[in-house]
UniProtKB/Swiss-Prot annotation:
It comes from the Eukaryota. Component of the ubiquinol-cytochrome c reductase complex (complex III or cytochrome b-c1 complex) that is part of the mitochondrial respiratory chain. The b-c1 complex mediates electron transfer from ubiquinol to cytochrome c. Contributes to the generation of a proton gradient across the mitochondrial membrane that is then used for ATP synthesis. It is a multi-pass membrane protein. GO terms for cellular component: mitochondrial inner membrane; respiratory chain complex III. Belongs to the cytochrome b family. This is Cytochrome b. Binds 2 heme b groups non-covalently. The chain crosses the membrane at residues 34-54, 78-99, 114-134, 179-199, 227-247, 289-309, 321-341, 348-368.
């Protein structure tokens, strides 16, 4: 009898065990689609980014012109750039929904998978930040100046660290060239970390909406979930192409159509929409070091989530108090995102401070209390 190549070939076996014969819970919902969508986002970004890098010049005097040249003179350069810029937004939509799913259904109790996931988020944020600097428009260079300057809040070594990061005494040519190098390198680091993320996931198997062990009821990944994922791919690519073709600059900043002017500061320096929640938390604390610590804590708090789990149940499916808190947290993040896009004046300052306080209170205090209360009410 002939050997089944798919199950016996050293390389094919890895693919088979990850994408074809993988035992998967029979009841996972559409919320479990976002992992594979993130994979598609990453591939799309690497391909479009590679094509863009062939025409880009990492020099302060030429960067803006090279991006302009790409959009005007390169075959479909405008489309590749629009797909790349809007692909980043979709990447963040998918990753935020993916994290939200993990929080809601208790997937964070797979601690290794969760921790690698948080590291992936941090790497993605770094990649996107250095990428946003590359077109060298007004918001690019000033964004780089403001965000890198935050490192100067670190006591004793701060100023040295910033100058080392800049490669000089201000954001200039060395900064741009190193940011381009980082932006080229980091997506491949993300790809490597993704494999580690999947390795840890396949050690324990996927969680499911009920949060109960599903060993007794598994189905093969292919054809059931490969078809389900394919539907997700099609829908996401429709959204991406629609955005890139009909309204490519909707999520960008008009300031970035102006080449960098080091002597003229834009009226409102603000990051892209996906960083606004963290930016609002940074701005809500009047002290520089305090703001930087709050900014870091707003993302690093995800590492603490598994330690704050006090419920006897894994998922929030049957926990109404926690569900209310979870949706309150979603609303709070939307408010922070909105406040981050507004100027620093009354009433936005106080709204931002209250929303920042609520963000940390819900995660650190209210979630554990609600979980303990639910245990008590259900006599668990």
């Amino acid at each position: 009898m002939a050997l089944n190549l798919r199950k016996n070939h050293p390389l094919m076996k890895i693919i088979n065990d990850s994408l074809i014969d993988l035992p998967t819970p029979s009841n996972i919902s559409v919320w479990w689609n976002f992992g594979s969508l993130l994979g598609i986002c990453l591939v799309t970004q690497i391909v479009t980014g590679l094509l863009l890098s062939m025409h880009y010049t990492a020099d302060t005097s030429l960067a803006f012109a090279s991006v302009s040249h790409m959009c005007r003179n390169v075959q479909f350069g405008w489309l590749i750039r629009n797909l790349h810029a809007n692909g980043a937004s979709l990447f963040f939509i998918c990753i935020y929904l993916h994290i939200g799913r993990g929080l809601y259904y208790g997937s964070y109790l797979n601690k290794e998978t969760w921790n690698i996931g948080v590291i992936l988020l941090l790497t993605l944020m770094a990649t996107v930040f250095v990428g946003y600097v590359l077109p060298w428009g007004q918001m690019s260079s000033w964004g780089a100046t403001v965000i890198t300057n935050l490192f100067s809040a670190i006591p004793y070594i701060g100023q040295t660290l910033v100058e080392w990061l800049w490669g000089g005494f201000s954001v200039d040519n060395p900064t741009l060239t190193r940011f381009f190098a980082f932006h080229f390198l980091l997506p491949f680091v993300i790809a490597g970390l993704t494999l580690v993320h999947l390795t840890f996931l396949h050690e324990t198997g996927s969680n499911n909406p009920l949060g109960i062990p599903s060993d007794c009821d598994k189905i093969p990944f292919h054809p059931y979930y490969s078809i389900k994922d394919l539907l997700g791919f099609v829908l996401m690519l429709i959204v991406l192409v629609t955005l890139a073709l009909f309204n490519p600059y909707m999520l960008g900043d008009p300031e970035n159509f102006t080449p960098d002017k080091p002597l003229a500061t834009p009226p409102h320096i603000k990051p892209e929409w996906y960083f606004l929640f963290a930016y609002a938390i940074l701005r809500s604390i009047p002290n520089k070091l305090g703001g930087v610590l709050a900014l870091a804590a707003s993302v690093l708090i995800l590492f603490l989530i598994p330690l704050l789990h006090t419920s006897k149940q894994r998922s929030m499916t049957f926990r109404p108090l926690s569900q209310i808190l979870w949706w309150t947290l979603v609303a709070d993040l939307l408010i922070l995102t909105w406040v981050g896009s507004q100027p620093v004046e009354h009433p936005f300052i106080i709204i931002g401070q209250l929303a920042s306080f609520a963000y940390f209170t819900i995660i650190l205090i209210l979630f554990p209390i609600a979980s303990a209360l639910e245990n008590k009410m259900l006599n668990l």
